Amino acid sequence: MRIILITGISGSGKSVGLTSLEDAGYFCVDNLPPTLLRALVATRQEEHADKLAVAMDARSASSLIGLPADIAWLQSQGHEVKVLFLTAKTDSLIARFSETRRSHPLSHRGFSSTAAEDRRTLTECIREEREMLSGVEEISHVIDTSGMSANKLRGWIKALIESDHSPLTVLFESFAFKFGVPLDADLVFDVRMLPNPHYDSQLRPLTGRDAPVQAFLQDQPDATALLADIRGFVEKWLPAFKKDNRSYLTVAIGCTGGQHRSVYMVEQLAAHFRAHEHVILRHRELD
């Protein structure tokens, strides 16, 4: 049976993720206490189910301590198990809670009357939840949903599901340092030392997907050398990541604005590795 466990920080999109899996044919259970996981799997197996998705949150944090052992046991029974940990930057989470006017699951009282006090209380809840779930995050594939719409997250989950046949999926992601490093990055490369097409008035409105920008960077010896170095590094260490039984490897490339240099590098890397790996491409500031 294919089993996907979804957990993570409240407000990061677990409900959207679970709905996406339901649309993909998974039998979904929300807010399942981890102690009931094995029993649920046994029941679904008796019913000859082949896909199961389960969402768990911080209210079960104490029970989640035993999750690694549960995963190992399920795998020993022949099940394919993946754990997705959804997270987002604190500012994004605060904005989402503000929009929905919902209280945090760890809050034991209603929000105070002032916005400043609301923000402080919510921030404390988010910080506590991160600490409670830090152990689970370490054994999961992390997805940073900061700035993602619900539709984008659905597409991201769909791409991950479609990669289930591959032992390792490589995710190449471009980003802007001014908006922060992606929380789900395993490897981060800084390409801000390369000549910036932004300062060419004809190239400024374009992106690293466009031929003129690509031609500009291909003419830069440093860009060619850096691309070769990053490609070589990933090629050298990819076998080690596979031996570590990882399902996903996220390689993040950053520049100042996430429009030109990082986009170009990610496009080139994705094109190269698609020949022999399952690749997913994401431009955080463009998509």
From Swiss-Prot:
Protein purpose: Displays ATPase and GTPase activities.
Chain residues that bind ATP: 8-15
Molecular function in Gene Ontology: ATP binding; GTP binding
The protein's name: Nucleotide-binding protein mma_3120
Keywords in alphabetical order: ATP-binding, GTP-binding, Nucleotide-binding
Protein family: Belongs to the RapZ-like family.
Binding annotation for GTP: 57-60
Top-level taxon of the source organism: Bacteria
Pfam families: PapZ_C, RapZ-like_N
